[in-house]
Amino acid sequence: MTTPLSLAVVGHTNTGKTSLLRTLLRDSTFGEVKNAPSTTRHVEEALINDGDDSLVYLYDTPGLEDAGGVLDWLETHTSARDDGIERIQQFLSSHEAHHEFNQEAKVLRQVMQSDMAMYVIDAREPVLDKYKDELTILSWCAKPIMPVFNFTQNQDLTAWTNMLARRNLHVYAGFDTVAFDFEGEIRLWDNLATMLPKRDILDRLINMRRREWQRLDTEARREIADFLLDAAAFTQEIAENDDPAPTLEVMQSEIRQLERQMQQRLFTLYRFYHDEVGSDSTWMPKAFKQDPFDSELLKHYGIRTGTGATAGALIGLGLDIATLGGSLGLGTAIGGLLGGILPNAQDITDKINGRQTLHTDPETLTLLAARELDLLHVLQTRGHAAQSHIELKERKAPWNAAKLPSELNKARSNRKWSSLNTHQPEASRNERAAYVATLSKKLKA
């Protein structure tokens, strides 16, 4: 059985130690994150497993607040001829370590009990004497220390790296706990591994994380594909002369709910448990707070609604009618309420039976696909410590609405594929299952 690696996370107050752990653990509830010093007052332990095997124990430590005071004590009460670790041990046995420098003592004890430490640096900060003092006393613990830069975006690290090099700290990593980068995390673990006599545990962790990342991506795209097929197969029939407006509104409501359920599954998959999709979510991008039937969203994603007199029919509606004679009059009748009806298809069976069939239009299916891929991108690039609002970059629809993937076109003629038709979710899921895998491969973020 492999002995787990123990890793202390240390640094000045409010540099992002707990945030780093939240992101590495994929746990947005670990510890407490505030924009205030000394939020963490005690050492907290967390564990990364690979199945039943424990790989790495991570220790969140209190912030170092008065390393200069500790260094002064060491220089006054210990001999420069003693090894650094002996001087630290003398400090930890002192009265001051249990009173005046209680927080610093907790950090140093944990470092000495660990295999190595990560020293978290706020890259926005200038190089100050207090940080030099912290690195000095940490180095006396005689454990490998790797600096980790947080908040690195648009920051010049030259002054920092020069200072670190003068202290013989040549291996470091940049890892933004807010704007998550999976490959950046892998580099962090890889850099840590280079500082150990044996790297087998961290190599195993790296391989596990790569497998997990690929699994999450595959499962997420399958969830999206399954939702799109469910929505595409959703149909309702009404009599030829019935007002479709009430039915259309019900259909829109059911698709909204179906989308929300799928989005929540993506949140759970990526372990953002306490965040909800919708207007109550403070950090969600504007696009996700908008109704999927909002015409502005079509413009946002560059989705064209067609040409000619019927182009405006889809705007704000999101559902077509495969209808029969008299459809033009019908469109005029409800145009003021729902933006019009697009008589885009003629179904001979409906015509004979005097029926209208309502179903989700290609533009709305394309919009839904674009929205869900955007959400996936957000979840894959957001650290679990992030608390701020996200601004989406300009993103495009995954396909031309006039050229839906064959799987969605097939769904539109197989009403049993939709749980909204059958009210039997598992049965409908089984009906469309064979097409989920192929559609998911066409969903490119």
Language-model regions, residue ranges each:
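Conserved G1/Walker A P-loop phosphate-binding module
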Residues: 1-91
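Non-catalytic alpha-helical scaffolds
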Residues: 1-17, 116, 140, 193-445
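Active-site-proximal flexible loops/turns
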Residues: 29, 67-70, 129, 157, ...
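Internal hydrophobic scaffold segments of catalytic domains
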Residues: 37-74, 186-200, 248-268
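An acidic- and aromatic-residue-enriched active-site/binding cleft used to recognize and process polar
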Residues: 38, 143, 150-152, 177-178, ...
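Conserved nucleotide-binding/hydrolysis micro-motifs of P-loop NTPases
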Residues: 63-65, 124-126, 152-155, 178-181, ...
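Conserved C-terminal guanine-recognition region of P-loop GTPase G domains, centered on the G4
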Residues: 78-172
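Canonical P-loop GTPase G-domain recognition
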Residues: 151-216
